[in-house]
Amino acid sequence: MTDPESPPPAPVQRPSRAASIGALVLIVEALGIAVLALWQVLAIFRGDTVSLASALALIVLTFLFAVAVASFAVATMRSRSWGRSGGVVTQVLVLAIALGALTGQYAHPFLALVLAVPAVIGIWALWAAARAAGRNAPR
């Protein structure tokens, strides 16, 4: 039963298009990270690991990162600033990985492009979502 003295619930706002795009990029990245963790689990069963303890720790951290990125996506859809800021940090980390894939002895330009393009789209979308949230904020 509701309290007659309590204020009415805030109206539900639909996320901006930019927030939806940013959240979609984050969800796809979270799924990719989860697949990477499953690949690491398979590497243990194939015997491709030197240290079981290190491999297990890396798997746990990878799954935790997948959950964190997925939570950034959910928070972005709910117009929470911490989700957008966490998403931007994630995109910057992905860009750093793309730069590493582009340079060095074992450079792989196509992989760098596959990583960099969604990260740039994600940064743009999350930045635009933050701008839209600022415009729609009560003053």
What label would you give each PLM region?
Residues 1-139:
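Topology signature of small-to-medium multi-pass alpha-helical membrane proteins
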